[in-house]
Structures are given as structure tokens and as C-alpha cells.
């Protein structure tokens, strides 16, 4: 089961919590859910150059508090905070209540699964060889403290007539272990040959206690304040040497 299911959904309530943190009844729930989806899509599209990894939406009474985790917060904030104020007004136009924006810097974007996936997708769109892009991203993540990385790419790789899937893995990525802190990211590269899907799993270590806020606590040590907020951190170097695998090839370990 752990091999197929989204690792984020599998671990909700165990070592991480939801990105939308509010409660509503009846038709109000559906309206707020669609509003969250609309806000996230608009922010991801508008802040594409900022390297946005995660958007958390909280809704205290008649307010909307949005926390954006980004690799380049300066792109969002702008000179003397001019851009973030304009962004806040645009987001407020999409919601009913008062909007507060909190920008948090990701200090190690090389170990963030979503940012790794988006970086590989950008390279594929620039016609970089997919194997080279995958290996570079894996090596950077392992060098900066990830305990294991797995990357899947699928589609018309290299412009081939028949679509296929290839994957690489380095270190450990225990998808069945619920206490494992596994970060997951997915995006699509739109190439001239068609769409190529990119999936990334990053293993950061194990969370031994039952703590749904473990991810937020870890990120607090890793990221630094970049707007009105703080940030968070991940695991250390693996005890064993890295192990690299490719589908169809034996391990080098």
C-alpha cells in the first residue's frame, strides 16, 4: 500500500497535519474548500519564480492567515515590501475576510521534494538530459542531509515514440513505515513532445513519537523568518554510505 498511495495523505495525523486548517459546516465547507483551491492555484502561478513549496491556510474568525514557504522570499516581498502588499490585496479580493500573509524562507531548497520536482521539470523543459537532471538533484539532496531520495519521471523521455517510466534511488526511502518522515512532491514538465510527470520522495529520518505537528516543528528549525513568520528543519546525514539504485540494475551497496 505504501508503494502506491500518496505518502503525505498516508501520514496525516501521525507525523504531519493538514495544509488547510479550519472547520466549517454544510455548504460553507464546500465554498471555503473551493476558495482554498483557487487561492493556492493563483499563488503558485503568480509566484512561480519564488520557488513556493507549501501554502498553509488558516481561518480564524472572519480572517484568513496564509503562510507561504518559499526558497526565494525576496521575490515575493519586493523592494520595501511593496510587492507583498499588492499580493495581499489581490488575495483579499478572492476571499471574504481580512487576509494576513506570512512568508517563510526555505533555507535548504535542495532537500525539499516539491522544489526538487519543479527544478527537474524546468530542466526537462530546457531539454536537459533527464538522467543528468535526476542524478544532480539526488546528489545535492544527499549532500545536504537527506537520508534517502527517490525520483520517478514518466512520459516520452528524450522524445521517444513510446512513453515509459524511469526511476533512481539513493539511500533509504521506507514508504511502508508510518513513522518515517517522507516528503513528497509532484509536478509536470510541458515539453514539445508532451507532458512528463516528475515525482520525488525525500526521506528525512523517523519521528518516534506520535505528533501531527512534527513536520511544522522540524521546519521551524530549518527555515528562517522572511516576512512576518518563522520557519522549520530536517534530518541529519545518513549513518551508512549512500546507496544508488536504478530500475533494472542491482544496487552498488
UniProtKB/Swiss-Prot annotation:
Matching SMART domains: KH
Superkingdom of source: Bacteria
One GO CC term on file: cytosolic small ribosomal subunit
Name of the protein described by the UniProt record: Small ribosomal subunit protein uS3
Pfam families xref list: KH_2, Ribosomal_S3_C
HAMAP family named in the record: Ribosomal_uS3_B
Assigned protein family: Belongs to the universal ribosomal protein uS3 family.
Domain (KH type-2): residue spans on this chain: 39-107
Family matches, as SUPFAM superfamilies: Prokaryotic type KH domain (KH-domain type II), Ribosomal protein S3 C-terminal domain
GO biological process: translation
Keywords: Ribonucleoprotein, Ribosomal protein, RNA-binding, rRNA-binding
InterPro entries from the UniProt entry: KH_dom, KH_dom-like_a/b, KH_dom_type_2, KH_sf_prok-type, Ribosomal_S3_C_sf, Ribosomal_uS3_bac-typ, Ribosomal_uS3_C, Ribosomal_uS3_CS
An annotated Gene Ontology molecular function: structural constituent of ribosome
Biased composition annotated in UniProt, kind: Basic and acidic residues: 230-253
PANTHER family membership: 30S/40S RIBOSOMAL PROTEIN S3, SMALL RIBOSOMAL SUBUNIT PROTEIN US3C
Subunit text: Part of the 30S ribosomal subunit. Forms a tight complex with proteins S10 and S14.
Amino acid at each position: 500500500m505504501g508503494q502506491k498511495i500518496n505518502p503525505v495523505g498516508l501520514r496525516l495525523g501521525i507525523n504531519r497535519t493538514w495544509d488547510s486548517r479550519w472547520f466549517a459546516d454544510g455548504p460553507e465547507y464546500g465554498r471555503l474548500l473551493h476558495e482554498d483551491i483557487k487561492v493556492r492555484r493563483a499563488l503558485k502561478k503568480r509566484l512561480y519564480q519564488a520557488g513556493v513549496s507549501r501554502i498553509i491556510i488558516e481561518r480564524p474568525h472572519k480572517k484568513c492567515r496564509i503562510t507561504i514557504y518559499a526558497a526565494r522570499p525576496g521575490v515575493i516581498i519586493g523592494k520595501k515590501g511593496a510587492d507583498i502588499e499588492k499580493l495581499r490585496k489581490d488575495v483579499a479580493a478572492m476571499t471574504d475576510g481580512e487576509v494576513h500573509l506570512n512568508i517563510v524562507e526555505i533555507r535548504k531548497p535542495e532537500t525539499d521534494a516539491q522544489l526538487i520536482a519543479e527544478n527537474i521539470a524546468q530542466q526537462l523543459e530546457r531539454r536537459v538530459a533527464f538522467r543528468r537532471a535526476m542524478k544532480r538533484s539526488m546528489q545535492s539532496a544527499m549532500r545536504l542531509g537527506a537520508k534517502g531520495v527517490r525520483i520517478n519521471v514518466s512520459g516520452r523521455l528524450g522524445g521517444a515514440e513510446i512513453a515509459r517510466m524511469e526511476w533512481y534511488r539513493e539511500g533509504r526511502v521506507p514508504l511502508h513505515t508510518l513513522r518515517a518522515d517522507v516528503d513528497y512532491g509532484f509536478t509536470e514538465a510541458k515539453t514539445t513532445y508532451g507532458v512528463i510527470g516528475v515525482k520525488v520522495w525525500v526521506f528525512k529520518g523517523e519521528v518516534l513519537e506520535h505528533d501531527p505537528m512534527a513536520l511544522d516543528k522540524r521546519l521551524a528549525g530549518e527555515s528562517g523568518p522572511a516576512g512576518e513568520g518563522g520557519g522549520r528543519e530536517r534530518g541529519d546525514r545518513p549513518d551508512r554510505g549512500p546507496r544508488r539504485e536504478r530500475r533494472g540494475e542491482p544496487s552498488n551497496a
